[in-house]
């Protein structure tokens, strides 16, 4: 059971109380314990092994299977190159495919050069006969090759963890007749249509082979369509025509094929006791400094498009990143700029305080999501080897080390403003402070009991597995969530019926 959630919570939720369950810990996968723990799985009589995603990825698939998978990918690209050349396709497309092929060949050579490690227990040796993957959308970046060019919406990123999962799914299909893998997710398609094809490759690979759709372009020609439309430019000024792979075609046939492996349940069908939600879209007017900075972003983008600036010096990724920071707070770009009233952060603080005061009798709690300007880790202090020397120790105490001023962060700014308005510091917490499973468990317990009333965190750290909804009444999005799975942490089942609020400060056109 690879899970992205807190593993102890997953064990408690297991439906069979008398089952013999093994739950992994971080210590189990430390370098000197990993082999022993894998042997324990292989030789033990367990009904289920609950394991974290990162730990699951550290159990290797056999070298022979990795080599076979890489050779299949190389052959697929070789066939694609031959097709493009035979049809008189663009030379640029051929070069792209050849670069990808060389990269895969280098990976294959490296794998072969590593040699065999006889002491490593592989996934095949564990004796696993079923694989249940929670939050399976974390494995959406599977290798994908296409002859399409200049088409947005095609996710071709190859993550090692996804390739590893694909190899393990193929193995499970072999030993179970394609009935050994179960994926669970609330967002099978988060930000790219290619993700549906990816799920089918994980769960329906043999079926795709029967239909001659193991190559993405064959699948896309039957079920996808490219659309050209005007879009707002990344720098936030003006529009541009953009072709995207963004529309499904032959949707009934696609859904019939997908439903061969998918059990789809919508919120209406489940009818769970979720709270009634009141949404607020808060608009913050840009300051004069922000308006001037947006003009500067536009000028930088024009130079990038014209090719007059070196990509290592400036590029659209940097410009977009600066635009996101600027959209949240101008002090992230320059801490010396003034803290002006009416900004996103100040409006958010006012909302938090009002809801905090209104919820005093019931100790109602709030979540604040912010993925930019997160808390910085305290600088590590170097300790001298001769620290136990009494003279040195006395000198160190007599001459205090000057403290470096902390860099500006939105998190700390919000905390200080809440404290200044009368909120006890003990009722405010950052998810980043809970850097171990034990601390995270304690923090969540405090939020559920109302001891911590405001919890700030990023989507990555406070997303999946954060079940603190007992007294939760409001959620604030300071920056715009990028994916559907990032939205709705407050929309969970409750033991008590109540109304909740979702405040979105996140829409930025820079």
Regions found by a protein language model. Name each.
Residues 1-9, 15-43:
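Conserved nucleic-acid-binding Ia/Ib motif block in the N-terminal RecA-like helicase ATPase lobe
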Residues 8-10, 34-81, 86-130, 161-194, ...:
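Inter-lobe coupling linker of SF2 helicases/translocases
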Residues 9-11, 24-34, 52-58, 371-373, ...:
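Conserved helicase motor
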Residues 33, 37, 412-415, 419, ...:
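Conserved helicase ATPase core of P-loop NTP-dependent helicases/translocases
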Residues 52, 56-63, 125, 139-140, ...:
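SF2 helicase motor core recognition
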Residues 364-372:
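Conserved RecA-like ASCE P-loop NTPase motor core of nucleic-acid helicases/translocases
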Residues 372-430:
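Conserved helicase motor "Helicase C" RecA-like lobe of SF1/SF2 P-loop NTPases
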């Amino acid at each position: 059971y690879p899970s992205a959630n807190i593993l102890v919570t997953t064990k408690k939720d297991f439906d069979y109380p008398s089952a013999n369950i093994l739950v992994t810990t971080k210590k189990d996968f430390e370098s000197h314990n990993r082999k022993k723990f894998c042997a324990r799985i292989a030789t033990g009589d367990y009904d289920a092994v609950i394991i974290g995603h990162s730990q699951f990825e550290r159990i290797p698939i056999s070298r022979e299977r990795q080599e076979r998978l890489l050779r299949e990918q190389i052959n697929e690209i070789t066939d694609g190159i031959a097709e493009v050349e035979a049809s008189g396709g663009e030379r640029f497309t051929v070069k792209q495919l050849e670069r990808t092929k060389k990269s895969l060949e280098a990976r294959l050579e490296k794998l072969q050069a590593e040699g065999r490690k006889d002491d490593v227990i592989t996934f095949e040796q564990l004796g696993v006969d079923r694989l249940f993957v929670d939050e399976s959308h974390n494995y959406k970046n599977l290798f994908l090759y296409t002859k399409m060019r200049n088409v947005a919406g095609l996710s071709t990123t190859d993550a090692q963890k996804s390739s590893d999962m694909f190899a393990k799914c193929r193995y499970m299909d072999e030993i179970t007749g394609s009935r050994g893998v179960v994926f669970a997710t609330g967002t099978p398609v988060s930000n790219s249509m290619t993700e549906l094809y990816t799920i089918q490759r994980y769960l329906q690979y043999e079926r795709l082979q029967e239909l001659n759709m193991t190559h993405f372009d064959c699948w896309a020609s039957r079920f996808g369509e490219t659309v050209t439309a005007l879009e707002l430019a990344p720098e936030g000024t003006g529009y541009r025509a953009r072709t995207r792979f963004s529309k499904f075609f032959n949707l009934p046939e696609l859904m019939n094929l997908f439903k061969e492996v998918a059990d789809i349940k919508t919120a209406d069908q489940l009818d769970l006791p979720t709270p009634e939600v009141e949404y607020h879209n808060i608009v913050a007017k840009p300051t004069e400094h922000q308006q001037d900075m947006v003009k500067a972003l536009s000028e930088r983008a024009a130079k990038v498009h014209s090719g007059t600036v070196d990509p290592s010096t400036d590029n659209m990724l940097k410009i977009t990143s600066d635009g996101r920071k600027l959209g949240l707070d101008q002090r992230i770009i320059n801490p010396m700029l003034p803290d002006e009233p009416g900004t996103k952060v100040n409006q958010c603080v006012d909302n938090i305080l009002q809801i905090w005061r209104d919820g005093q009798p019931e100790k109602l709690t709030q979540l604040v999501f912010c993925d930019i300007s997160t808390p910085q880790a305290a600088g590590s202090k170097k300790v001298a080897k001769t620290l136990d020397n009494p003279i040195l120790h006395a000198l160190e105490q007599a001459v205090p080390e000057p403290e470096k001023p902390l860099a500006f962060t939105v998190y700390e700014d919000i905390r200080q403003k809440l404290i200044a308005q009368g909120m006890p510091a003990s009722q405010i917490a950052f998810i980043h402070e809970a850097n171990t499973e034990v601390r995270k468990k304690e923090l969540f317990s405090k939020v559920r009991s109302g001891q911590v009333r405001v919890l700030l965190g990023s989507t990555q750290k406070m997303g999946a597995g954060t079940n603190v909804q007992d007294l939760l009444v409001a959620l604030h999005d300071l920056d715009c969530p990028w994916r559907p799975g990032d939205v709705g942490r407050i929309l969970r089942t409750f033991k008590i019926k109540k109304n909740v609020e979702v405040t979105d400060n996140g829409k930025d056109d820079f």
